[in-house]
Swiss-Prot record:
Recorded name of the encoding gene: eno
GO cellular component: cell surface; extracellular region; phosphopyruvate hydratase complex
EC number of the protein: 4.2.1.11
Pathway assigned in UniProt: Carbohydrate degradation; glycolysis; pyruvate from D-glyceraldehyde 3-phosphate: step 4/5
Listed name of the protein: Enolase
Organism of origin: Levilactobacillus brevis (strain ATCC 367 / BCRC 12310 / CIP 105137 / JCM 1170 / LMG 11437 / NCIMB 947 / NCTC 947)
Keyword Secreted: yes
């Protein structure tokens, strides 16, 4: 047995300069693991609770000293003495200690910090890379990246309502090549925006946040940038986007209010708008196309779009197996976005990925807009053979850290590694995948 001997938490900063929780966990044998917790800007209302102090005299109320104290004074007393390799028991003990359905007592940020630190300490104790510890000998699939290169919505101050416009190097032969293709497209996009007189300042996730005219212009510019980089839109590099529709949905009027277009849409009209975009551009994935509480509208959208493109539930599912099970039963979406801090433990995260796979849904392992230098998600996506990762643009150190880790892992795995590209979309049939590639 490898016994946990000490746990210590502190307040550090995320990529937005806001406080977050960092946890260090030690074993009797001298192993150590560190976990830093991310945070989101647009959050689903059903997410696990991120405990903040609310003291306006510190960090404008965003301090996390309560969560830190909960680790040091409550969680540590319970978890010290556990076998560090017994991840499921450690996570369950913290869930029981909290005793609430949304981790509102101790804070998901406190619990997740310990969960991540325990996994890293166990890997350190065993002398294994984290992806190898989490996935065993089977973890070998490098993910197709979703690279957020144009920001809108809550991630930027501009007229674009949709939150993220992403490129996916589906035609690459390896993740290293995919990252190169993404970088080249990113830099060609920057040159193109400069030529058009747009700002090339970047948003929270490292993508550009130009003040574009409407919600369609980003697609036009992305296609041009992909071509300028020497690639074929669709065949080499496809497009994904995140509507984050709950952010512009009016629950009283049941309308989607797009400021960039100066229009309001019913659910049916909005899905028709999305259909027109899918028909016109090489789109492979749409995230949160409808409001997180409108399940029947999601059903309608899935019937109309689910055979053509990946439909990812983020705010809809919030990495929660209860919501995912409901979605699977109703035939809602065909993919889940996996964010560790939405649910709060590594164990529950893995359970959500497994449930998705068993139902034929893809699982996209994701960062948050408030990120850190922690690279756990890069190891996790390989460990689980999830096949897709969403971890920001080709700028900002906290995003690049994940890409660098993926390239290290691919290098370590050597010839046993696999990059699936367009075939990572196993939720679409071959005809749908080829339609995107040949668009």
């Amino acid at each position: 047995m490898s016994i946990i001997s000490d746990i210590y938490a502190r307040e550090v900063l995320d990529s937005r300069g806001n406080p977050t929780v960092e946890v260090e966990l030690y074993t009797e044998a001298g192993a150590m693991g560190r976990g830093i917790v991310p945070s989101g800007a647009s959050t689903g209302e059903h997410e696990a609770v991120e405990l903040r102090d609310g003291d306006k005299s510190r960090f404008m109320g965003k301090g996390v000293t309560k969560a830190v104290d909960n680790v040091n004074n409550i969680i540590a007393k319970e978890i010290i003495g556990y076998d560090v390799t017994d991840q499921r028991a450690i996570d369950q003990a913290m869930i029981d200690l909290d005793g609430t359905p949304n981790k509102g007592k101790l804070g998901a940020n406190a619990i997740l910090g310990v969960s991540l630190a325990a996994a890293r300490a166990a890997a350190d104790e065993l002398g294994q890379p984290l992806y190898n510890y989490l996935g065993g000998f089977n973890g070998h699939v490098l993910p197709t990246p979703m690279m957020n290169v144009i920001n809108g919505g809550k991630h930027a101050n501009n007229k674009v309502d949709f939150q993220e416009f992403m490129i996916m190097p589906v035609g690459a032969k390896s993740v290293t090549e995919a990252i190169r293709m993404g970088s080249e497209t990113f830099h060609n996009l920057k040159n193109l925006l400069n030529e058009k007189g747009y700002s090339t300042a970047v948003g929270d996730e490292g993508g550009f946040a130009p003040d574009l005219k409407n919600n369609e212009e980003p697609f036009e510019i992305l296609v041009e940038a992909i071509k300028n980089a020497g690639y074929v839109p669709g065949k080499d590099v496809a497009i994904a986007f995140d509507c984050a529709s709950s952010e512009f949905y009016n629950a009283d009027t049941k309308k989607y209010e797009l400021v960039g277009d100066g229009k309001e849409y019913t659910a049916e009209e909005f899905v028709s708008l999305l259909e027109s975009i899918v028909d016109k551009y090489p789109v492979v994935s749409i995230e949160d196309p409808l409001d997180e509480n409108e399940w029947e509208d999601w059903q309608m959208a899935t019937e109309r779009l689910g055979k053509k493109v990946q439909l990812v539930g983020d705010d809809l599912f919030v990495t929660n197996t209860d919501y995912l099970a409901k979605g699977i039963k109703m035939g809602v979406g065909n993919s889940i976005l996996i964010k560790l801090n939405q649910i709060g433990t590594l164990t529950e995260t893995v359970e959500a990925v497994e449930m998705a796979k068993q139902a034929g849904y893809t699982a996209v392992i994701s960062h948050r807009s408030g990120e850190t230098e922690d690279t756990t998600i890069a190891d996790l996506v390989v460990a689980l053979n999830a096949g897709q990762i969403k971890t920001g643009s080709m700028s900002r150190g906290e995003r690049i850290a994940k890409y660098n880790q993926l390239m290290r892992i691919e290098d370590q795995l050597g010839k046993t590694s696999e990059y699936k590209g367009i075939h990572s979309f196993y939720n679409l049939d071959e005809d749908a995948r080829m339609a995107i590639v040949n668009k």
